[in-house]
Amino acid sequence: MNSFPAQNLMLSATNANKDSGLRTSNAHWLHSCIAVPKTTGIDLSQEPPAEGVMVPQSHLFPPPIRDSRNDTETVKQKSVNQSPSKALKPKPQRKKRSVSNKSKKTPSIPETKREKKNLDINIDISSFDTSGVPPPVCSCTGVSRVCYKWGMGGWQSSCCTISISTYPLPMSTTRPGARLAGRKMSNGAYVKLLARLADEGYDLSHPLDLKNHWARHGTNKFVTIK
């Protein structure tokens, strides 16, 4: 008797297949006969896959691990986009600037009533005689000060400028040795003022106070002279 009956069965099966003319595969026999060590990590309890059967990739590779941080970030973005409270918040109204700063600025010159200039008045000053009229004065400091001659028959204040009112005027910082220039009135504006006051009944034998007749800025050259 043979002490290896399994080998005899394998030989008899292969010889029978050869005689019948069929091709055989010894993979199954080899798999069943070859001993696999336990250290290989292969689970022997599972049956080997049949020949020609595709094994799904889910059994070969583990499923990918999803990062929970991305899920939390997407949930936060959705909650931010879906919150209507931020989109419906009304814009805060801007506070209007108070006008108190302008009122706090007090000019050094006391405010006086200025006459309204009528630019449509045309006065013929060619026949108006100013030879007997005394030089004008300015009483912005409380005392009447005689004005200086300026230009071609014009007059300049000796005690006030647009911003200050004092006598004598302080020295100029831009022109060494000269004082600040006072307010000015051209000859045409002065003669026109005399003609208008004479029509109103003013006595031209007395010096004319130019305190309320100075121009607000610069000179009185805006009048029309004919």
From Swiss-Prot:
Record's subcellular location: Nucleus
One MF term in the entry's GO annotations: DNA binding
Signal peptide range in chain numbering: none
Tissue specificity annotation: Expressed in seedlings, leaves and pistils. Detected in anthers, in pollen grains, in young rosette, in leaf vasculature, in the lateral and primary roots, in embryo sac, and in the whole ovule.
Transmembrane segments: none
Stretch list, region Disordered: 42-116
GO CC field: nucleus
Keywords: DNA-binding, Nucleus, Transcription, Transcription regulation
Bias kind Basic and acidic residues: ranges: 66-76
Basic residues biased stretches: 88-105
A Pfam family of this chain: GAGA_bind
Family from the record: Belongs to the BBR/BPC family.
Function: Transcriptional regulator that specifically binds to GA-rich elements (GAGA-repeats) present in regulatory sequences of genes involved in developmental processes.
Listed name of the protein: Protein BASIC PENTACYSTEINE7
Organism in which the protein naturally occurs: Arabidopsis thaliana
Taxonomic lineage of the native organism: Eukaryota, Viridiplantae, Streptophyta, Embryophyta, Tracheophyta
